[in-house]
Amino acid sequence: MLNRKEVHNSETLNIQIDSHDQKSYLIELCKDCTKFDLNVECLENSFSKFFILNHAENACELNINMVLKQDANCQMGVLDLEKSPLKWNHYVDLKEQGAEYEILSGQLCQEHIEKVCDMEVRHNAPHTNGQMKNFAVIKWLPMEISKKDVSMLSLIRQRVY
């Protein structure tokens, strides 16, 4: 069963995926969304999927904090095609052995619209797996794009510990 959530203005959502449970979430950041905090704890042997779709028309802040316990598996997708700034902080703690996390994200980056993503997947136990696949499409009217322009358009920092 798919759990749906529409986010308006500034909201916080706390989710716990119970042991041996399976959950799927579709989260839509609505046009009036300015800030969304998502806190998720995936307990032992759980399986979860999250898809976050940004529709915010103005600057928005997205904060995601996840903790995965032993043999928990979580897959996440984030899609941001809006012509508005996005500040995205994403932190994942793989706390116990066997925890697995995968994120696939796509962003449309345009001139003078700042998209900043700070993403960390921290391996706090042996035999954990974390994968980050981030894609950015750069839409720019002039055909010449310098390295400086690209860095101003989209700043993505990934760290694996």
Give each language-model segment a name.
Residues M1-Y161:
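Conserved beta-strand/loop scaffold segments within soluble protein domains that form the structured core
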